[in-house]
C-alpha cells in the first residue's frame, strides 16, 4: 500500500518473491524501505491501520507489540498505528485454521 501511494508498483517490484534474499526476511525490512521511498519523494506517512483475521493463533496478546514495531519501522507515534484482530467465526479457510488474512490502509501526505 505504501509503494502504491507514491505511484510505484507493489511490494514485489522492490522485493521479488523469486529472489532468495527475501525468503524468511523480517517484515521490518520491507516497512523501512517503504517509509524510505515515501521520504525520498518528500512524503509523510500520516497513519496506518490494519485488520488481522485469524482463527488461530489468538493475536490480541501481540497487538501492542505489533503496533510498537510498526510505529518504530515507519517513524510514527504508536498512536498513529491502528491494529485490530478478529476471528472469522470458524467460517471458511480462516475458520478452519488453514490461513490468515490481513488488510491495511495508510494515509500519506505528498507534495504536489
Where are the regions a protein language model picked out?
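C-terminal edge-of-domain segments
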Residues: 96-112
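Short, small-residue-biased leader/transition segments that mark boundaries at the very start
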Residues: 1-2
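Helix-adjacent hinge/juxtasegments
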Residues: 7-44
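Short, conserved loop-to-beta-strand elements that form functional interface hotspots
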Residues: 48-58, 62-94
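Short helix-capping/linker segments at secondary-structure and domain boundaries
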Residues: 5-8, 112
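Structural signal for hydrophobic packing residues in well-ordered secondary-structure cores
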Residues: 35-42, 67-70, 74, 78, ...
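Gly/Ser/Thr-rich beta-alpha loop segments that engage phosphate groups in nucleotides
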Residues: 9-14, 94-97, 101
Amino acid at each position: 500500500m505504501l509503494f502504491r501511494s507514491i505511484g510505484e508498483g507493489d511490494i514485489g517490484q522492490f522485493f521479488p518473491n523469486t529472489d532468495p534474499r527475501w525468503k524468511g526476511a523480517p517484515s521490518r525490512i520491507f516497512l523501512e524501505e517503504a517509509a524510505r521511498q515515501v521520504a525520498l519523494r518528500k512524503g509523510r506517512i500520516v497513519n496506518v491501520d490494519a485488520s488481522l483475521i485469524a482463527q488461530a493463533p489468538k493475536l490480541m496478546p501481540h497487538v501492542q507489540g505489533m503496533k510498537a514495531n510498526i510505529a518504530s519501522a515507519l517513524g510514527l507515534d504508536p498512536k498513529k498505528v491502528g491494529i485490530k484482530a478478529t476471528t472469522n467465526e470458524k467460517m471458511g479457510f480462516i475458520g478452519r485454521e488453514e490461513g490468515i488474512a490481513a488488510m491495511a490502509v495508510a494515509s500519506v501526505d505528498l507534495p504536489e
